[in-house]
Structure formats: C-alpha cells, structure tokens
Amino acid sequence: MQITFLGTSSGVPTRSRNVSALALRLPQRSELWLFDCGEGTQHQFLRSDLRTSQLKKIFITHMHGDHIYGLPGLMASLGLAGNSLGLDLYGPSALKGFLDGILKSSSSRISYPMKIHGLELESAENKIIFEDNDFLVTCTPLIHRVPAFAYRVDEKAKPGRFDVEKAKALRIPPGPIYSQLQKGQIVKLKDGRIFNGNDFCGPQRKGASFVYCTDTMFAQTALKLANGADLLIHEATFSHEDSDLAYQRQHSTSTMAAQIASEANVGQLVLTHLSPRYAPGNRISPNDLLSEAKSIFPNTLLAKDFLQIEIQKHATVRDT
C-alpha cells in the first residue's frame, strides 16, 4: 500500500500546500481510495502520477469545506471521463444531502454507479464499514465541532511461503493442487493420500495497516483505533505553544498527535493538516512542529503535498 498526500494544509490552501486530501494506492488491484477531497483535489491529481480512472472509494472525515469542496467537481469530471468502475462514498450522514443539492442545482450528470454510505456518531465506534478478501476498513468518531470520523485500513494477512521442495519430495503433482495447499486447504490426491496445506506453509505474513485521523483534539477513540498500526496520519493543526487554540477549536497540536502515536505503539507518525500560520519564515515553522512531535515520538515525518510513503510493516499486532 502506498500513500500520496494531495493536500496537507488546514482551512485554506497556501502556495505550497493544498487543503486536505490523500490517496491510497492499491497496486495489487489497480485501485485508488481517496481520503478527504478539499477544493482543488482534482488539480492535484493532474500534478501527480495518480489516475482518477482507478478511483473506487472516497472516505470523507467530516463536512468542513476544506475536506469536501473538491468533491462535486471531481465527481462530475469522473462522469465526463466515462468512469466505469463506479464509486462508493463513506462519510457523515450529511454527505448525501450536500452532494444531492450541488449535483442537482448544477445539472451535473453522474453516469456511473454511485453509493453513499452514511455514518452516525452514535453507532460508529470501531465500526467495520467495508470488508472483502483483501482489506478491512474500520471507522471511529472523533472530537470536533461537527461529526467527524477517523478511518483505519488493514490489509489482511497473506498465506505463508509455500514449500515447493517439500511438495515435490512427496510427489505431489504441481498445478492447481499447489494453489489449494497454499491456501491451507486439505487436499486428497488420486492415489488416496491426504495432505493439509498448513503443513506446507510458513507463518502467515502480516498485512500493512494505516490510520487517518483528522479533524480532532486528543481522543481516546483515535487511540484505540490506531493501536498497533504501521502508519498513523494525524492532524497537527497547532503547535504545542498554541494548545489553548487547539482546545478552543477542537484540533490537535503536534504533541497531541505524537502522544497518540506513542500510546498506540504505531510504527510511524506523519503530521498533516498544518495551519498556514506556521509558514516557513514565521516565528514558528512546520519544522518546529516536527521537532515537538519527535521529542515524544521520534519516528515522525512532516507531510507535504505529493509526498509518497510506502507503508512499512512493523512487528506490533493489534489487539482484537
């Protein structure tokens, strides 16, 4: 799994940072999943190596403009481009009314299948919102001025390495039987011998995981969702010095994000959603926020637009 940041600013865009959006690339299935879609996101796609034709799912954290104003334009453009994949959208229950109103009033034609999955705060804690053979997506409510949700994506464990030499030594004929054994299935050969696939496979290979957490102040729900994740992407709107503002506006400081990362025992933390007040050259700069976070959680990076991160697995196993 690979992350591409398409927008890392809070509230309004700057010359170097667009507002919130990030893409998750799933090369094994030629799909893209988008998390938030601030104004100008489709322009950011054009400046990246990502293809909107692969876009399959969009996850919206909350209904503030810097996270959703790019959505109607992107959806309309997908229709004009003849997107045939269809689109699933996940987000607060108000998302449907927002899109219905804009698309209807602008006479925008959505020519592809679209389904909106509305989320409610009361029933969303650690809620599974999508699952298939490869991935599990979970959400949880956050603490913000409007209903907001964090998302976690877990890649399911893969079968362990198949011992081909052992199978050959036992004169098991190659072909579809090897595939069955690799999946852990019990196979009966024509000569009557029975083999358990688990006897030919090493330990399961843990899948990668990441959590996207914005907008929120420090939240126990976020801590629980992030437990053991390989990568935590967490908002850091304010510096520790401006923690009073963070509490007033229900945002996080860099140190709050680092505290979540440390207590959740994640592999890596990336700070995003930075206030424009911390532009380079100002008294407090983005690098100062990074230093604050690293004093608590050393394996921290500062997001910037078009930064790409290959999610690296670490040994921690999430509690269930």
From Swiss-Prot:
Binds 2 Zn(2+) ions. Zn(2+) 1 binds at residues 62, 64, 144, 215. The gene is rnz. It comes from Prochlorococcus marinus (strain SARG / CCMP1375 / SS120). It is an enzyme of class 3 (hydrolase). The active site is at residue 66. This is Ribonuclease Z. InterPro entries: Metallo-B-lactamas, RibonucZ/Hydroxyglut_hydro, RNase_Z/BN. It catalyses: Endonucleolytic cleavage of RNA, removing extra 3' nucleotides from tRNA precursor, generating 3' termini of tRNAs. A 3'-hydroxy group is left at the tRNA terminus and a 5'-phosphoryl group is left at the trailer molecule. Homodimer. Zinc phosphodiesterase, which displays some tRNA 3'-processing endonuclease activity. Probably involved in tRNA maturation, by removing a 3'-trailer from precursor tRNA. Zn(2+) 2 binds at residues 66-67, 215, 273. It holds the Pfam family Lactamase_B_2. Keywords: Endonuclease, Hydrolase, Metal-binding, Nuclease, tRNA processing, Zinc. One of its GO terms (molecular function) is 3'-tRNA processing endoribonuclease activity. It comes from the Bacteria. Its EC number is 3.1.26.11. Belongs to the RNase Z family. Its cofactor is Zn(2+).
